[in-house]
Swiss-Prot record:
The lineage of its organism: Eukaryota, Viridiplantae, Streptophyta, Embryophyta, Tracheophyta. It is found in: Cytoplasm; Membrane. The gene is RHO1. This is Rac-like GTP-binding protein RHO1. One of its GO terms (biological process) is small GTPase-mediated signal transduction. The keyword Membrane applies.
């Protein structure tokens, strides 16, 4: 077995969209019932991919505005970002392009982003929308449209509570680092030959 490769994966997104729950669900197969706003937490998980061990360093960030100046410190050295929004929060969906993409492009240009819609279990929960009349669900088509807009290689909807697609989120993050999508080559003007006289 070859030596393990370290991949730094940073989760970002609005406060209360489920970033910490996603990480806890992935690393411990449990769902936390209490909401505690994150300052910064790190997790580490060894994952075997195609016979090679990958040490996946998982960095959690706080989405609240109070941390706007502190949060980018965790971006340094990131190999991939998981950009999360809630499938039951139109504001968090809109902030992907309004707030998060500009921030990531400024502090970590060129780092791939996996777009993730969280709280999939609540999107189809009629009782949730009765209890929260202002909530607006985000459709899969809207998520896919946003993925194209921000040029993300993948969009995944998941539920940390039911574990649906949780592993798929991190598999996609690992895959985009180990096998980056081929960049379309720009047609360059004919290269000039160098002549030595």
């Amino acid at each position: 077995m070859s030596a393990s490769r370290f991949i730094k994966c940073v989760t970002v997104g609005d406060g209360a969209v489920g970033k910490t729950c996603l990480l806890i669900s992935y690393t411990s197969n449990t769902f936390p019932t209490d909401y505690v706003p994150t300052v910064f937490d790190n997790f580490s998980a060894n994952v075997v991919v195609n016979g090679s061990t990958v040490n996946l360093g998982l960095w959690d960030t706080a989405g609240q505005e109070d941390y706007n100046r502190l949060r980018p410190l965790s971006y340094r050295g990131a190999d991939v970002f998981i950009l999360a929004f809630s499938l039951i929060s139109k504001a968090s969906y809109e902030n992907v392009s309004k707030k998060w993409i500009p921030e990531l492009k400024h502090y970590a240009p060129g780092v791939p982003i996996i777009l993730v819609g969280t709280k999939l279990d609540l999107r189809d929960d009629k009782q949730f929308f009765v209890d929260h009349p202002g909530a607006v669900p985000i459709t899969t088509a809207q998520g896919e449209e946003l993925r194209k807009l921000i040029n993300a290689p993948a969009y995944i909807e998941c539920s940390s509570k039911s574990q649906q697609n949780v592993k798929a989120v991190f598999d996609a993050a690992i895959r985009v680092v180990l096998q980056p999508p081929k960049q379309k080559k720009k047609k360059s003007k004919a290269q000039k030959a160098c002549s030595i006289l």
